[in-house]
Amino acid sequence: MDSVSFFNPYLEANRLKKKSRSSYIRILPRGIMHDGAAGLIKDVCDSEPRMFYRDRQYLLSKEMTWPSLDIARSKDYDHMRMKFHIYDAVETLMFTDSIENLPFQYRHFVIPSGTVIRMFGRTEDGEKICVNVFGQEQYFYCECVDGRSLKATINNLMLTGEVKMSCSFVIEPADKLSLYGYNANTVVNLFKVSFGNFYVSQRIGKILQNEGFVVYEIDVDVLTRFFVDNGFLSFGWYNVKKYIPQDMGKGSNLEVEINCHVSDLVSLEDVNWPLYGCWSFDIECLGQNGNFPDAENLGDIVIQISVISFDTEGDRDERHLFTLGTCEKIDGVHIYEFASEFELLLGFFIFLRIESPEFITGYNINNFDLKYLCIRMDKIYHYDIGCFSKLKNGKIGISVPHEQYRKGFLQAQTKVFTSGVLYLDMYPVYSSKITAQNYKLDTIAKICLQQEKEQLSYKEIPKKFISGPSGRAVVGKYCLQDSVLVVRLFKQINYHFEVAEVARLAHVTARCVVFEGQQKKIFPCILTEAKRRNMILPSMVSSHNRQGIGYKGATVLEPKTGYYAVPTVVFDFQSLYPSIMMAHNLCYSTLVLDERQIAGLSESDILTVKLGDETHRFVKPCIRESVLGSLLKDWLAKRREVKAEMQNCSDPMMKLLLDKKQLALKTTCNSVYGVTGAAHGLLPCVAIAASVTCLGREMLCSTVDYVNSKMQSEQFFCEEFGLTSSDFTGDLEVEVIYGDTDSIFMSVRNMVNQSLRRIAPMIAKHITDRLFKSPIKLEFEKILCPLILICKKRYIGRQDDSLLIFKGVDLVRKTSCDFVKGVVKDIVDLLFFDEEVQTAAVEFSHMTQTQLREQGVPVGIHKILRRLCEAREELFQNRADVRHLMLSSVLSKEMAAYKQPNLAHLSVIRRLAQRKEEIPNVGDRIMYVLIAPSIGNKQTHNYELAEDPNYVIEHKIPIHAEKYFDQIIKAVTNAISPIFPKTDIKKEKLLLYLLPMKVYLDETFSAIAEVM
C-alpha cells in the first residue's frame, strides 16, 4: 500500500470544517499524496487556502502575517518635511466616489475625476513609501480660429460619450513657436487645452487630430509632463515641504503613504541610492503529457517557485522555496508547503505583497516565468492578482505589443508590469551585452561566473518530484540554484545602475528604459530643450515625413581587396553622426520648410544639402542654434566631466555609478540620429537623416581625395610631421584601400613602423584641421599588419604584434561549429604569425595559372595544405569530437510561425518532441549535428540530417564528414581568398585541387572487405 506522505486537509474533510467564501479549482500531482504515483488530482474545493511552514498551518489571506518575516512598524514623521528617494512612478485616476478618506485639500483635483501621480521609493530612514501627488495637469496645444468653438467641441465630445469620462478642463491662448521647421513667428490661433484627467486629455487630443485639427504634444504622457515641466528626476531624491499622511483608506500596500501637491516637491541632485530590496525567482513546472508546459493547459502546473531575497548592496541572502507537497529540509532555506497549485501561487503573490521588493530579476522571467504565473492565475483560476502589487487596485500583467508579434524574439519582448516593481530580466541583458554560442543560464554562468549548474534533466524532474519529500528537495535545490546564479549575474553586471542613469538623463521611468525603444527616451529630452526655447512639438500624422523619400544609407567605399603585408593605419571619426549634426546645425528647428521664412537671409546663413533631385536647407547657428545640437553638446560636455570625475574618484561604488552615467550619455548621443530616421517614430524627419548620411559620404570621399592627392611624397611628411630620410625604407606609397561608414583604412608602404606609429595621431589631426568643421574629429585607432581585406565589412588584421582583429569572417560567426572555427583560426594564425607562410602568401597571390602548373605552390603554402589534410583525416575517420561539430540556429519565434518548416533546427526540435525530451524556448540557440546519410542518399538535405548532439554521442552515430569538410573549404577560402592568384578556376576548386587525393572507405565497405 502506498504511504501517505502529505497531509491534505481537503481530502480529510472532517478534520477541518471551516469553509471559505468561494471555491476554486484544486490541481495537484497524485505523487504528493502517494509517493511515486503518476497523474494529477483535479476537483473543486471550497475550503480556505492554506500553507504549511515548519509543521504549522497558516491560512492564506492578503492581510496575514508571514511567518518567516519580521516586518517592522513605520515610525512617525514630521508632517512639515520629509526626504525620500524614488525608483518608480505610475499615473493613476481617482474619481468622486473614492474621495471619502482623501484630505479636503486635494479633493477638488479629482472631482469628477483627476490624475494622481503615485511615486514609490524609500525614506531616508529606509522605509518603503508611496507618495500621492495631486495637481499635475495634462495638456496639449491645438490650432483653432475661435477658442469658444474649441471649448464647445470638447464639451460635445464628453457629453456624447465618445470619451466615456468627464473632468475639468481649461482653454487659454498660447504664444509658442513650432519646433518643426524654421519659423521666426509664433503659431497663430494657438490654444493650450489643460485637463485634470490624463486619459481624457489623450482621447480628446486624438479625436481632434482625426477630425483635422492641427494639434501639438498629444503624445506626451502625464509622467513626462510631471518630470519635464517641474524639472523633477525620475530616479532620485526629493524633499517634500509639506504633506498629509494617508492613515485611513490607503491606496497602497505600504506602511508609509502620504499626499502632497506637485508644488510641495523639491528634486535633489544626490546620486546615492538607499538600500532597495530585490528578488531573484525561478519556477519549475510539470507538463501533464510530458511535453514542454503550456500555461493555458489546465494540467501543466507550477510545482515549485524559488525566491532569493537580497539588497542592491550588501550581503543579505534569504532563500525561500514554495513547493507542492512535503519537502525535506534544505539548509538555509525557508520551505513553504502547499496542497494545490492555486494555494502555491496565492502564497507566492501574498509573499510578494508582504515583502514588497522594489526590483525583481530572474532568467527569461519576462517571456516565461512571470508570464506563466500571470496566465495561470488569470486563465485557469480567474483570480485578479493586481492587489498584490504596491497598490491595492494595482496591476500585475504582461503584454506583447501587437506590432511586435511578427518581429521574432530578438527584436520583440514581452512587457511586464507590476505597480511599483521594476523587472530586470538578466536574459535580454546578457544576450545584448556578450557574445555566446547560446544564452542558456548554464552557458552564461560558465562564461561570466566560471560556475556550472548542477544538472537535473528535464525528464528527471517529474520522477524526482513525485518520488517523495527527498526527491522534492532535490528538485528544490535545482530550482534554487538558478535563482542564486542570477543574483550573482545581477551583481556582476550592475544593470540597475545603468538603467537608473538613463532614466535620470532622459526624464523617463526606469520601466521605460527597460521596455521601450530609444525614441521614447530621446523624445522627452527634445521636449525639455524645446520647452526652454518656448517651442512645442507637433503631433505627426501620416505624411511625407512618415512615408518619406528613400534616402541612401551610410557609404562604404569599394575595398581594394588583397593581402597587405605592409602597415595599414585605421582612422575613425569620433561620434560621427552626432558630430555632423552639431557641426552643420541640423535639426527640426533649423530645417527650412517655407522659403518665405528665409527671404531676408543671405545664402551664407544657410546650408544647402543636395541629394539627387532633392534639396534640403538648414539655417546656420548665427540665425538659430539647433535644438538637437544643444542637447548633444550638453551631453558630450557632461560625459567629459563625468569621465574626468571618474579619474579622481577612489570610492568603488561612486566610480561604478559615474561609469554607468557616462555610458548612458554616450548611448543617448548615438541614438539621436536614429530618432530622425525612424519612419514610424514620434518625430521622423527624413530631411535630417538623409542630410547626415550625405554629409558623412562627402567627408569620407574628401578624406580619400586628400590622402590620394596631397599625402603622396616624402617631402609632405617631412614638412608636416618632421620626418627625415631615415624614416623611409624606399619609395613611399600611401593609399586609401577602404572606407566604411566612419572608418578609413590607409596603407603605407616603405615607412619605418615606429615612425608611422608616432605620427599616426598627427595625421588624424592634420586631416581634421584641413577638412572638417568642429566638433568633427578624425582619430587614430590602430595599425594592422598584416591585413587580409576580403570584401566590404570583412577583414582580418594583426594589431600590436599579437592581437588578431576579425570582422565578418566565419571564425566569429555564431552559426559556425568550433571544429571549423579551429581550422580557420589555425590557418589564419599561420598567415599572421609564420614569416615563411607570409612570404609564400605574397608570392602565391601574384602567380599565374601557368606558373602554378609548372612550379607548384610556394613552400610556405604547404603548411596550410597540411592543416587541411589533418582536419580531413579527423572527420572522415570519425575522430573529431562531436561537441566541436555542433551547429546552431536561434529559435526566433514559435515553430508554427515559420513559413519554411524544413529548417535544421526545427527538425531537431521535432525529433526532441517525438522522444518526449525537453523542448527549447523561443529565443534559445538550438544546437545540432549533421549525421551521415543512409547509403546511396548523397543529396540529403541538412534538415533531414540534423540531430541533437547528446543523442548522437549517446548512440555513437557517425557524422557527415563530407559536409563538414565542405564547410571547412568554404570557410578557409572566404577567410584567405585575397592570397589566391587570379585564375579562371574558382577558389574553392583550386584549394581542393591543391590537396593530395585520398579515398575513405565507409564501415559497410570495410566489413565486406574483411569477409572477402
From Swiss-Prot:
Entry's Gene Ontology molecular function annotations: DNA binding; DNA-directed DNA polymerase activity; nucleotide binding
Annotated coiled-coil segments of the chain: none
SUPFAM superfamilies: DNA/RNA polymerases, Ribonuclease H-like
UniProt superkingdom: Viruses
Cystine pairings recorded for this chain: none
Single GO cellular component term: host cell nucleus
Protein name in UniProt: DNA polymerase catalytic subunit
Organism per entry: Human herpesvirus 6A (strain Uganda-1102) (HHV-6 variant A)
